[in-house]
Amino acid sequence: MAILIGERPAQALWRDYLELTKPKVVVLMLITSLVGMFLATRAGVPWTVLVFGNLGIALCAGGAAAVNHVVDRRIDAVMARTHKRPLADGRVSPTGALTFALVLALLGQALLLTFTNPLTAWLTLASLLGYAVIYTGFLKRATPQNIVIGGLAGAAPPLLGWTAATGHVSAEPLLLVLIIFAWTPPHFWALAIHRKEEYAKADIPMLPVTHGEHYTKVHILLYTFALLAVSLLPYVIHMSGLLYLICALGLGARFLQWAVVLYRGTRPHAAINTFKYSIWYLFLLFIALLVDHYLLLNL
């Protein structure tokens, strides 16, 4: 790799490469993948699929994130939120990051092919390319609907977990994908409002930059309503029970409250608080799905 390891402590270099994988994002993805796995079967997930399947998904996601760092390094350098990232700050070279990304992706694919099935490997590869190439390389700079169109790649983990456990696609995991797909726009647009000036400086056509904050707030509100409706569908189709319904209603009502506060502009930090809550929303919603699933099995 084009990195002079001797110039920096190995521990610092290790942390830089770990940062390239966006570990916090990958952890949230793995939670949804795990839920997809456990919801797919009543018999339990084989430990090899559970461990190596999720590791393969995580490695591929980390590889895609590293490519994102490479492509966005000039954008990251002019944004306060990202200017200290390893490539933007010059601590890791583009060649080193791309090599790292390729190694992660190949290892991830090898694990998926060995311990799960070809369908999961292909779907994971499609998700990787969708995020790293289509979204990062094109959509992000081409349209203010970048998040909406590109959100499908980031919504795939529960489907990947499901297919890893079963070897086939069915309606239930697609519904989980739909939940994340509906969650993505209000999640990212809230951050885009908070970082509007930085996105404008970086010449990224995020919705608040191209259409203004009011327009974006209206769409956040509309998507949050849609998300609340979609999140109830697992109960409607008898995929989940009463516990999940109560959690989905409570979490969704709170998300909707933040969207209304953001729309009205009555609190100075509503945008970033909406963004932060959206992360907890998705985490808790999928945990509720999982707990409810095992509660139903024991009734």
Swiss-Prot record:
Q: Does the keyword Heme apply?
A: no
Annotated pathway: Porphyrin-containing compound metabolism; heme O biosynthesis; heme O from protoheme: step 1/1
Alphabetical GO CC annotations of the entry are: plasma membrane
Q: Which PROSITE patterns match?
A: UBIA
Q: Which CDD domains match?
A: PT_UbiA_Cox10 (cd13957)
> Does the keyword Mitochondrion belong to this entry?
no
Q: Which UniProt keywords apply?
A: Cell inner membrane, Cell membrane, Heme biosynthesis, Membrane, Transferase, Transmembrane, Transmembrane helix
What parts of the sequence cross the membrane? 25-45, 47-67, 95-115, 119-139, 147-167, 173-193, 226-246, 279-299
Q: What EC numbers are recorded for this enzyme?
A: 2.5.1.141
Quote the subcellular location field of this record: Cell inner membrane
Q: Catalysed reaction(s)?
A: heme b + (2E,6E)-farnesyl diphosphate + H2O = Fe(II)-heme o + diphosphate
Q: What is its main location?
A: membrane
Q: How does it sit in the membrane?
A: Multi-pass membrane protein
Q: Which family does it belong to?
A: Belongs to the UbiA prenyltransferase family. Protoheme IX farnesyltransferase subfamily.
Supply any other comment.
Carbon 2 of the heme B porphyrin ring is defined according to the Fischer nomenclature.
Matching HAMAP family: CyoE_CtaB
Role according to the record: Converts heme B (protoheme IX) to heme O by substitution of the vinyl group on carbon 2 of heme B porphyrin ring with a hydroxyethyl farnesyl side group.
Q: What is this protein called?
A: Protoheme IX farnesyltransferase 1
Species of origin = Pseudomonas fluorescens (strain Pf0-1)
The record lists the lineage as: Bacteria, Pseudomonadati, Pseudomonadota, Gammaproteobacteria, Pseudomonadales
Q: Which gene encodes it?
A: cyoE1
